[in-house]
């Protein structure tokens, strides 16, 4: 990696990263857990790429629903806020200035902008196509997940909510982990942390959308829901570790947090449009690893740039 991250890495220490991880998860959990419970109790829809159109068209039920939605959305800023705190404690204002410089770095090879559009489709399309071909996603049921007049609002909303996780994940955490680990190991570790950060919402989503047979004894419902949550959390962690490799490839080759922000937005928007049957979740989870393995083979595990840390070509066998 080039010297642009020196202001962050200069004050490197393990406790700072631990502080970052705890602060990111804690801030978000404080926002997400209570709002998820209140939403479930009152039948409120929480904002997400999958509910955006429904919420935009139906509106909020009442003032409490609006407050819950706002607090839930604020929870997405946990990684960003934690990064600001950790960087300031480590290296002060210069580190924060460097982070914001990388957040606004838009002058990169145009091919990276193409990749952030194409890659989400390459990852999501296989499950979508298999769903149609197998009948699990009947053509007769296909509709636009988001009306075209809401596409731009969805893009902007995702850029400035979920996209702004990236100053934390790729702007701070990834460079910190790469001080100790190669790109592959840093990506997998970050992917697991990133997934754990999502767990309160994933648990809520799994429980709120679970469909159990009507003849299931009431005493078994809790156990079945717990099993479904555990399975979903595991699959999410595996999938997120794979997609974290893709983010590392994008970031290490551009040193642009903006590219990561736009890729995050693009992935969420495409996923919202190409929804498929829950029965194909495993395929959706595997596809990031298919892409990750290709990138690791082509660009090398050490930096994912085709070069090793000594600046020479990283040849893979």
What are these model-predicted stretches?
Residues 17-20, 113, 172, 186-187, ...:
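Alpha-helical transmembrane segments and their helix-entry boundary regions
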């Amino acid at each position: 990696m080039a010297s642009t991250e020196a202001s962050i890495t200069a004050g490197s220490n393990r406790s700072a990263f631990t502080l970052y991880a705890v602060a990111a998860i804690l801030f978000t959990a404080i926002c997400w857990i209570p709002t998820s419970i209140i939403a479930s109790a009152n039948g409120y829809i929480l904002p997400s790429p999958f509910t955006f159109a429904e919420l935009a068209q139906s509106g909020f039920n009442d003032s409490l629903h609006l407050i819950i939605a706002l607090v839930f959305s604020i929870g997405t800023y946990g990684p960003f806020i934690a990064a600001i705190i950790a960087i300031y404690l480590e290296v002060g204002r210069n580190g924060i200035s460097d982070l914001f410089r990388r957040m606004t770095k838009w002058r990169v090879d145009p091919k990276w902008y193409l990749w952030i559009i194409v890659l989400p489709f390459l990852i999501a399309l296989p499950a979508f196509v298999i769903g149609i071909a197998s009948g699990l996603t009947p053509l007769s049921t296909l509709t636009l997940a988001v009306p075209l007049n809401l596409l731009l609002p969805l893009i902007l909303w995702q850029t400035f909510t979920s996209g702004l996780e990236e100053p934390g994940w790729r702007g701070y955490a990834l460079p910190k982990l790469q001080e100790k680990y190669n790109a592959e190991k840093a990506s997998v570790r970050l992917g697991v942390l990133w997934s754990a950060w999502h767990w309160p919402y994933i648990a809520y989503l799994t429980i709120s959308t679970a469909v159990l047979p009507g003849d299931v004894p009431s005493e078994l419902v809790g156990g079945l829901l717990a099993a479904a949550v555990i399975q979903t959390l595991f699959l999410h962690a595996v999938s997120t570790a794979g997609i974290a490799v893709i983010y590392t490839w994008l970031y290490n080759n551009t040193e642009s947090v903006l590219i990561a922000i736009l890729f995050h937005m693009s992935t969420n928007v495409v996923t919202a449009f190409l929804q498929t049957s829950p029965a194909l979740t495993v395929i959706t989870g595997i596809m990031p690893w298919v892409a990750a393995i290709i990138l690791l083979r082509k660009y090398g595990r050490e930096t994912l740039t085709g070069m090793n840390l000594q600046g020479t070509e990283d040849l893979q066998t």
